[in-house]
Amino acid sequence: LSLDGTKNKSKLGANAILAVSLAVARAGAMSVKLPLYKYIRQVYRIDEKNYRMPVLGMNIINGGRHADNGLSIQEFMILPKHKLLRERVRMGSQIFHALAGLLSQKGYATGVGDEGGFAPELLNNERGLQLIMEAIKLAGWEPGKDVFLGLDIAASEFYRHGSYYFMSKKQAWPASRMIETFKQWVKKYPI
């Protein structure tokens, strides 16, 4: 990480850093003949019983650099809640298909962005949240109980000269306005 030398790791980039980190971890695991997950637990001294499986986040609407649709948020995600992974995957699939039908019904394009989520031309970022909430309900699930929302804001992508260009490339927002917007969303949506 120190090789990059920048505060936000922009010189090497997250993809390169992640790839090298994973390669080093795999090499370490292979050298001691352990599965990767056991090696990582050993290196970080994680007790066998003291761990949680990662939460499954599914990217279902793309914006930012992943889609040419005017949305500044890079990834709108759903996080299905269930004990079994296969059920979380099934729930996500149902919601994804419900969103496809909803977008089509409302006249939005159903093409996908670089990350596999839909890339509709929406009026604003919040409209993406509203459509996902609607799709969750259409699929028969309860937002905030069965399914939660996640966002990859990727704010560094629209930050220039001390301001955020969140809603438009011409209107600058101070950090305080961004924070207030996200606070309102957290109250309004199960993020």
What residue ranges belong to the model's regions?
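Gly/Ser/Thr-rich beta-alpha loop segments that engage phosphate groups in nucleotides
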Residues: K7, N15, R65-H66, F118-A119
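Metal- or metallocofactor-binding catalytic centers and their adjacent structured scaffolds
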Residues: L1-L34, V89
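Metal-dependent enolase-superfamily TIM-barrel catalytic cores that perform enediolate-based chemistry
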Residues: A67-I191
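Short beta-strand segments
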Residues: S21, I40, N59-N62, L79, ...
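Beta-strand segments within the central parallel beta-sheet cores of soluble alpha/beta enzyme folds
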Residues: L1, P35-N59, D146-G150
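Short glycine- and Lys/Arg-enriched binding-loop motifs that mark or flank ligand-binding interfaces
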Residues: K9-N15, N59-I60, V112-G113
